[in-house]
Amino acid sequence: HKRKFLVLNMTKRSIKKSNQHFQKAIHQLPLGVTSNFRYWGDEETIYVDRASRCRIQDIDGNEYIDYRLAYGPYILGYADPRVDQAAREGMDIGGVFALSTELEYEVAQMISSMVPSAELVRFSNSGTEAVMAALRVGRAYSKRDGYIMIEGGYHGVSDSVLWDVDLDEWDPKQGDPKVQPTSHGVPSRIGEMVTLVPMNDADRLEDVLKKKHNEIGTLL
C-alpha cells in the first residue's frame, strides 16, 4: 500500500477529520477501511469527500492529484461527463442483469478490433476474477498446474497470486528462490505451483521456461 498521491498544497496539511473518522471506522471496518490497500496507518489514512478529473479532495479539504485511478477503472478521470452519461443511460434500462444484453456483443467487438489477438471476450467484475479465470483457462488448455509470475507484478487478491520472493538475497546458483505468501491464510501448498522471476530479466525467464516447460501452463 505505497502512497501514490501528490499533495497540491505543499504546506503542512491537517487530516484531523480523517483521523477522527478512522477512530470510528475501526470499530466497524477492519483497519477502518474496505480494502487493506486503503489503509496507510492509524494516523495517515485519509477519507475522500469528492473527486473530479484527476483530483480528489479528502474530508479535511486537502486536494491531491490521484495516480491510482481507483486501481485502473478511472483512466478517463473522475466524473467524466461521457462516462457518467453512459452510466445513467444504463441505469435507465435496468442496470445489471443475470442475463446478457446486446451491448455485451457490441463492446466485445470493439475490444477485439483494438486487440486482434482477443478472438473471444469474457467480462468479469474485477481484475482478481479475470486473473482467476485466466489461470483456470491456462490449466485447462495446457493440462499443467504450474504458473509464472513476475516479481513486483500485481494480479489481484486471490490465493493464487499472493506470493512474493526476496530476490535481493537470492543466489541463482542455489536454484529457484523460495516463494512466500504475502498474507496469512494462504494455503502453503499453492506455493508449489508458483515460480517467480525477476522483473526485466528475459534470460532468467527463458531459463525457467526451459527447465520447467513440462510444469508451467500459464505466464502472468
Where does each model-flagged region fall?
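Generic structural signal for well-ordered, non-membrane alpha-helical segments
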Residues: S14-S18, F22, D49, D80, ...
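Active-site and channel-lining beta-strand-loop segments
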Residues: T45-D66
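Glycine-rich loop-to-alpha-helix module at the N-terminal edge of alpha/beta enzyme cores
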Residues: E63-R144, I148
